[in-house]
């Protein structure tokens, strides 16, 4: 059984963290809450605990096992081995209003995710999520990290009060409050983190949210971000090897991502 396209608010237990960055280079796109920026340093560095976002691209997340609401002990590197790019979005607890809002958006727009795989990370236990969803399966991967191990490893921090707010966040909280949700507006809040990840956990792109809602607004936005990452990687490869034939396979071709590096919709 798959979830319906509306994720209900179950409780008000928000184990929050956040992540911020000093991104650089070219602007990718804009929406009402954010400006998306590419950062592509040289590849091959090892990642260390507590690294800032400007050092994440080109590093590899170590191999680990994770639990989903229905399946324990999944291999992260196996998840990375798929023939399509993997986008990871770090959210607050499953029952947090922002998490509920964006999971709902992703469920509603899932058909527009063609050629991309999605994994959302929530700071809730598998048991809590399974209870809230009555054991229903998500149509994309939901990684449960209640202790915040991944958040901590990637250097996730917190933003307080108005620094983490946006107009969209205000609307989300207003609607949640009308449904009985209570929160401390001055408490630390987690800011989202969006990654595009390749094989062996290599981080190809990172965007650290400047507000609670500075993340892809739906599956169409997720796909467009990933297409730009693939295009940029292919262009970088062509610049690095200018004497190669046009028939030489690009990195997206080699990993089966060619369907994103074109004009198809």
What is the role of each PLM region?
Residues 1-14:
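Extreme N-terminal basic, low-complexity initiation segments
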Residues 13-14, 22, 30-33, 42-46:
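Intrinsically disordered, low-complexity polyampholyte segments enriched for Lys and acidic residues
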Residues 40-85, 132, 183-265:
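Non-globular targeting/processing and membrane-anchoring segments
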Residues 79-106:
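Short active-site neighborhood of thiol/selenol oxidoreductases, capturing the structured segment around
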Residues 100-153:
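Structural microenvironment flanking redox-active thiols in thiol-disulfide oxidoreductases
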Residues 145-214:
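Thiol/selenol-based redox catalytic cores and closely related redox-interacting motifs
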């Amino acid at each position: 059984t798959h979830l319906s396209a509306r994720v209900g608010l179950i409780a008000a237990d928000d184990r929050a963290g956040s992540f911020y960055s000093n991104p650089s280079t070219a602007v990718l796109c804009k929406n009402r809450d954010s400006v998306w920026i590419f950062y592509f340093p040289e590849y091959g560095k090892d990642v260390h605990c507590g690294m800032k976002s400007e050092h994440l691209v080109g590093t590899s997340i170590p191999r680990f096992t994770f639990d989903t609401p229905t399946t324990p002990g999944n291999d992260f590197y196996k998840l990375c081995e798929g023939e399509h790019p993997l986008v990871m979005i770090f959210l607050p607890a499953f029952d947090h209003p922002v998490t509920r809002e964006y999971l709902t958006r992703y469920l509603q727009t899932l058909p527009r995710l063609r050629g991309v795989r999605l994994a959302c990370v929530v700071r809730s236990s598998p048991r809590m999520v399974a209870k809230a969803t009555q054991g229903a399966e998500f149509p994309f991967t939901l990684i449960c990290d209640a202790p915040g191990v991944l958040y901590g490893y990637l250097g996730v921090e917190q933003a307080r009060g108005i620094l983490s707010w946006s107009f969209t966040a205000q609307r989300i909280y207003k609607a949640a409050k009308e449904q009985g949700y209570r929160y401390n507006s001055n408490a630390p809040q987690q800011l989202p983190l969006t990654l595009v990840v390749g094989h062996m956990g290599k981080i190809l792109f990172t965007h650290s949210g400047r507000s609670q809602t500075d993340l892809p607004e739906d599956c169409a936005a997720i796909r467009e971000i990933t297409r730009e990452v693939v295009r940029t990687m292919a262009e970088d490869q062509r610049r690095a090897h200018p004497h190669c034939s046009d028939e030489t396979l690009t990195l997206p071709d080699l990993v089966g991502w060619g369907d994103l590096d074109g004009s198809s919709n």
